[in-house]
Amino acid sequence: MQSATSFFNRALFRKNLQRFWPLWFGYVLIWLLLLPLPLLNELADYHGVPIVADASYYLLQIGAYGGLVMGAVFGIFFAMAMFSYLTAPRATQGFHSMPVRRETLYATNYLTGLVCMVSALVLAFALAGITAACFGALDLTALGTALLAAVLSVLFFYSFAVLCMMFTGQILAAPVFYGTLNFLAVGMEYLVRTFAGNFLYGYSGYSAPETFAFLSPAWELVCVLDVSNVARVDRILSDGTYQVIRGGEYMLSGLGVLGIYAAVGIVLAVLGLLVYRRRASEATGSIVTVAWARPIFKYGVAVCAAFSLGQLIYFLVFGLNLHNGQYSLPGTIACMLFTGLLGYFAAEMLLHKSFRVWRTGRVGALVFSAVLVCFGVAMSLDLTGYEGYTPDAEEVEFVSVYLSSNGDYLSCKLDEPESIERTLAAHRAMIADKARQLSYARTTYETPADAPVDSYLYFTVTYALTDGRVVRRSYGDCRAFSRELNEPGSVAQTMTALLNCPEAALDRVLGELADDKSNAYLTGGYYDVVSDGAYGEDDGELTAAQANTLVSALRRDYEAGHASNASLFEDTLYSGSFYVELELWYSVRVDEKPTRQPIDTTSSSSGSVCAIVTPEMTCTLEALAGMGIETPATARGF
């Protein structure tokens, strides 16, 4: 027997290997079936000479995603095996009566599981490397990166699982805690956003990135890890631009995030030791063994049940044929209160191992009920000021706007002071019209034919503030009325003013080309003169020089207000008897120097924008005439 002050117990280590070798063997076998054997088959069946990049891609894919899944699944299995004695009273008393410190027990059991998992990885990746080398397709960098990713995943998930084992004395509770905590933050954030989206006017959290996803490790790593092709800037073209060509190599992104989680895993392992040192042997068999964690478990179950089951019950019973404007906040809170109390008392029963929990849990139930009701009251009265908040114009660096209607639409980024002021005015008009907009939504989703609705609106605004904050609001299924166009501050008047501000009008037509500082350059285009609805009266291609001339003319027309006013109620671009359709082609200039550094290859390097030239746009019509493009004399106006 080792000394009581020893950090590592060899006898216990060997005993663990003897007891749990089937789990170890199964883990090794699965890794062999995942990595070296499929790689061997792929390289053996390859037509021609195997490419190193193909083997590298497979190694990185398995190292990242296979390591993530295997580490997450088998991490809890090995933790349950190595610390299974903590869930049986006799085994717990037996281990703790040994002349071995708890630190030694913890370290030995922890390292046994870690050695089993890491040794399997080393064996599998070593065989994969030998296989690739035999076919001349070995990339040591990719092999090492893939192995490192798998080891880091094991380190975090196994440590996390061990920590979960320290908090429970029930063997089956450990995987439940472990699985729940891996997705709890992102799940609760989704449920809270769903609740807010139903009852907060203008809430746009659905489109915002998850704020607390990093607290859900499995979800975050699935989103972050990615194996992508490395793009390289290979050569400079004659016009001074760079040609981006995909390279044959692959890279694993997200490895830094995985390294952070692995470092957190080491911290979790130390925390597990601290919890184990203070864990009472008598707590074996309890659902939660740590006293301070029992209230967290109890109220956590209540909150999760309220937001998940409560909203689900309300939706199934009342909400299948409803829409956001028709949801009842009191009804939803009542369902959440019912399911939350069920969850609360269920947790009490698990903690006390008895059905008689009313006396011990009634105070906590009242506290939970009061908090939930206060939450509902705060939502209904908008005590946080969320619905009515708009930033000051001086605080806004730029604003992204999306506005769709029965007529024209707008989707662009605005940074001019006038544009920001008009956006804020339209936003405030939507806030002031809240009661009427919601009343239309509650009346019926299908508006009757005789209802005074001229246009449906969908309005989304995202403010980027100078202090780095982002404010998002979204208003869907709204209405605008043409009879209110001349009423200052009305939805129709402010939205129309926003559509027709020079910056918005120019951006609506020219898109990326509207910005003088854009790195896009024109390569040509196409024109088509449409008269009385007939296409093909006069059409043809445009040179790059002609396209640049037309863009300058379009910019002058829009800045001078020559274009027809945009409307919420009709499509102004195609409503006339004469117009010219322009399709302008552009490419995006790559500013990077010739290098092999990774470049974002997901964004398009070329594209096109369409512009409609109406009879009022005299500058553009003059430019077309100067190019010899015939237009109806009555429309040219010169």
Residue map of PLM features:
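Secretory targeting signals
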Residues: 57, 64, 111-174, 186-187, ...
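Terminal transmembrane helical anchor/hairpin motif
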Residues: 41-59, 186-275, 280-289, 307-335, ...
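Helix-loop-helix units of permease transmembrane domains in multi-pass membrane transporters
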Residues: 82-115, 284-285, 543-562
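Aromatic- and glycine-rich beta-strand/loop motifs that create alpha-glucan
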Residues: 1-28
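Central hydrophobic cores of alpha-helical transmembrane segments
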Residues: 172-185, 360-372
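Function-determining sites in protein domains
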Residues: 359-368, 375-638
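Internal/C-terminal transmembrane anchor helices
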Residues: 297-308, 344-386
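Long, hydrophobic alpha-helical segments
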Residues: 63-91
